[in-house]
Amino acid sequence: MSLQNLTRFPRLELIGAPTPLEYLPRLSDHLGREIFIKRDDTTPLAMGGNKLRKLEFLAADALREGADTLITAGAIQSNHVRQTAAVAAKLGLHCVALLENPIGTRAENYLSNGNRLLLDLFNTQVEMCDALTDPAAQLDELATRIEAQGYRPYVIPVGGSNALGALGYVESALEISQQCEDAVAISSVVVASGSAGTHAGLAVGLEQLMPQAELIGVTVSRSVADQLPKVVALQQAVANSLELQAKAEIILWDDYFAPGYGTPNEDGMAAVKLLAQLEGILLDPVYTGKAMAGLIDGITQKRFKDEGPILFVHTGGAPALFAYHPHL
């Protein structure tokens, strides 16, 4: 597969140079396995993160349609909403965010610090709801209201996770394969699996470019039974848009997200502290901490296909640390 497959889709150059792919020597020594990390936490805008890859395609489509407003939804501490708001600010667009409080907390840090603080800095119009029970319908209803006020809205789904946004992680797979070429033969790739776009895009790209590497999604919000159909549906939609076959098995581990989305757990927080203390790299309590906990336990329990090098895809999320600091 070549980049030619993606050139049919408008894309904004928001990231620029490839994000680093680094060897983690101290973590590798600690775990007894070669560990590499793809640093998508270092993307430009709003303290970094994976959603910018999706927004390169989604925001380009919004501009193509003549939109003047980006509308999206997520949790109060959503990394996706924060990055969408930053892109809107950069492009001179209005941004409306529909937020929920998925953990039902009244803690002031969660309600006003971290990602939520940054939304105010980006001049985001925030609308609260009791719960995102049907986010697609709720976003459509919000878009109708915003349009009635004279705006031209463009709706971005939760997590930027549709077939168009997930192309950002087909691009990422191309980047990873080029960085690994003649450098390291990655055996396994680990990524947090939430709204499914990042996981699905990587699945399509890596199947074409690094078929020897198993891709493992560590769920952050759902059981395998609930998450698998979401990832598979997006995997197929992305492949269809690129006129490719998607035959790779989707592997999910759901042992590490309890007690639920947005609520830290002991193993996840231990992983956050371990990476900070061994490598000076910041994970987060919601996504990457739990995904790293899965990687660590996967080595201990011998869940990987072999003992070859592992690549951890760091999707960002460090601003949430400031919202969860009592847990640290």
From Swiss-Prot:
Provenance organism: Klebsiella pneumoniae subsp. pneumoniae (strain ATCC 700721 / MGH 78578)
Entry's EC annotation: 4.4.1.15
Catalytic reaction list: D-cysteine + H2O = hydrogen sulfide + pyruvate + NH4(+) + H(+)
Family to which the UniProt record says this protein belongs: Belongs to the ACC deaminase/D-cysteine desulfhydrase family.
Protein name per Swiss-Prot or TrEMBL: D-cysteine desulfhydrase
Alphabetically ordered keywords of this record: Lyase, Pyridoxal phosphate
List of residues that carry N6-(pyridoxal phosphate)lysine: 51
Membrane spanning residue stretches: none
HAMAP family per the UniProt record, alphabetical: D_Cys_desulfhydr
SUPFAM superfamilies, A to Z: Tryptophan synthase beta subunit-like PLP-dependent enzymes (SSF53686)
Summary of subunit composition and partner proteins: Homodimer.
Listed PANTHER family: 1-AMINOCYCLOPROPANE-1-CARBOXYLATE DEAMINASE-RELATED (PTHR43780:SF2)
GO term, biological process aspect, one: D-amino acid metabolic process
Cofactor(s) the record lists: pyridoxal 5'-phosphate
